[in-house]
Amino acid sequence: MTTPELTAPETATLRAADGVDIDACHDPASIDPASVDVQGGSLALVVAHGFTGSWRRASLRRIASVLATTGGVVSFDFRGHGRSGGASTVGDREVLDLEAAVRWAWDLGYERVCTLGFSMGAAVAVRHAGLHHEVDAVAAVSGPSRWYYRGTTPMRRAHWVIERPLGRLVGRLALRTRISADGWDPVPEPPHEVAARISPVPLLIVHGDADRYFPLEHAEKLYAAAAEPKELWIEPGFGHAETAVPDDLLRRIAAWLATAR
């Protein structure tokens, strides 16, 4: 299936509830919305990237172009990433950033707003839905079920970047991510605990059996904790998050978000 190319997006600077500026963009649907099966009216998909990501990167623009064949797409940079202000808190105050993006989607006039998060963004999407119930459906891709996981080499490296002064310097210079030196106080509830409060909002958990960051136990724990309506998709050969997600899987996720109830 050929994916239509995106035109220049509408960009905006959003303001999170704690005053941090959030760089965001809006891509309208690239096809006639009437040709898509959508539950409840015009659809916006709000995309939450993973740690060190940015909506301006090629991987996220590809995702937006695929999703735009189903509905409008709102993308944004979490605090400490790209052109957004502030410093990354790696999944804590990022809930406020997603809240600002969701609010913008509603302000744009969409009648159905759903969130799609990858890795850290998946954890944020789960927490946002459980805390605020402001969306119609949630998809969490390659997300962790708990904090401080160090069971894989990539996650041990990630914790070095987050927790060590030299690591944060590398994060700023090489990964273009500004990371807060302050620890969590208090520690936010882990995603698997918040997942239990998402219902009645539909939750889709997607995980690859080739994920090198978080093994399948994370997806299984999230699914076990959540109440209905919920679905778990284990994808053969899929690696981790937005850089690995294939177009056909994105289309399936978008179709699920468009109709889940």
Over which residues does each language-model region extend?
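N-terminal cap/lid segment of alpha/beta-hydrolase-fold proteins
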Residues: 1-37
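The serine-hydrolase catalytic nucleophile loop
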Residues: 51-64
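Conserved alpha/beta-hydrolase
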Residues: 64-85
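Alpha/beta-hydrolase active-site loop
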Residues: 89-108
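Hydrolase active-site cap/lid region
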Residues: 133-184, 201
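Short beta-strand/loop motif that positions the catalytic acidic residue
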Residues: 198-199, 205-207, 211
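Conserved alpha/beta-hydrolase "acid-adjacent" motif
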Residues: 212-218
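Catalytic histidine-centered segment of alpha/beta-hydrolase-like enzymes
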Residues: 238-248
